[in-house]
Amino acid sequence: MKTLVSTSAAPSSPLYSQGVTAGPFLFVSGMTGTDVRTGQLAGPTIQAQTAQALRNCLAIVEAGGGRLSDIVQVTVLLSRPEDFAGMNEAYAEFFPTEPPARAVTKLGVELPNVLVSVMLTAYLDRV
């Protein structure tokens, strides 16, 4: 059985669910660095956008009953490969110890001024 997870603390769209639980797993859709309070990107830098994208993802995890330590896999999509080091700076602050599994690849669509998108999976051990 699947359950949709949503929160006003992260960007949303009628085209996708912010998160979906299936069994003990919570799948979070790709989130950009958009700040829902302003409707704008958190800033022009990869660090600012990565940090905000991760905060958006965490808001969805928390709405689904999880927490940061429940995140088991992260996929980061970069618009520009040269932003890899800057993304890692922000990522390391978010996951300073015991980071989840991760993949980094190129973002396949061009979104104006968007440097990064993050999607992830959390394991919600409710047993």
Q: Each PLM stretch: what is its role?
A:
Residues 1-55, 59-72, 78-127:
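N-terminal presequence-like segments and the immediate start of the first folded domain
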